[in-house]
Amino acid sequence: MKNQPEWWDPYSCQPYKLKDESKPRSRWSNVWDYAKTGLTALLGLPLIVISYLLLRAKPSSKDPKEFIGLSIDLGFGYESEMVDMVNELGVENLLLRIPSWDADDLDSYTDFLSELEGKDIVINILQSPHSTQDYELWQSQVRKIIGVTSGFTNHYWIGNAINRTKWGCRHSGEALQLQEKVEELRSEFHNLFILGSSVIDFEPLLTWRSLCNFAKFKLEATAALMYVNRRHSPYGTQYGIFDLKNKLRLTKAMIRLSNRSKNKLWITETNWPLLNTKPYTPNSGNPTRTVDEATQAEYLKLYYQIAYQSGWVE
């Protein structure tokens, strides 16, 4: 991050966890949105179950090298070394985060992007905790970011972790409004490839709400921050049956039914945080959530293999 507000943790590159007294109190808008989420899930459940049961795995036809991407960040002072490491790895698909609050200070980002010539870039435009308080400002910030970076890419992933209050959205309805304000920019920028939904972890109710609604936007692909580290390996289950493969299967089944997204699933974030790396990993030292380097490498390899063999992930 170029600029780091007081609510931003520069080590873990995310907003600080909200204290109880800082969490927004429930309002009628929250209750109404929760009701919409529940009703949408209830009405969609039969079709989702059918879609899930009919879905069959089919290994991806992509070159495995094209299937793998890497997320990079700016602001640590070793951008040239990072470019060298990216080239050494041979990875071609890169994701660069640009926070909305850096919209007036983009020179360092464009300089960095210039050094990544020839790479396929996706830019993740991060919302701030204040974005849902001023949607016009949010739109203006996104407009500036796209305008300055459109010479490097037309792929933009909008928002991050919409189901975490510390990122600014008190409920999914606010996230949909952020997406709508970006949709209005299509008349100014042609051939945009927009990713959205942006639900972190496995929360199918909110994923379905973000994919099936009457908001005014369209997505070229669904972005899922599908972390499974709390279940240990990718074969660990949640709710008894949902290991990584079944989580991908359910997410893909919902995308196939979506009236907001094309039938494309991108896993835009996943990882296993490392042991003994505080303050960069806030919960480091907890063996139920963090792993050593050898285990991380093994789990990431399994994750990629499962996702690739399913054929459900782009």
Whereabouts are the PLM-identified features?
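Substrate-binding cleft of secreted/luminal carbohydrate-active enzymes
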Residues: 2-27, 44, 153-156, 264, ...
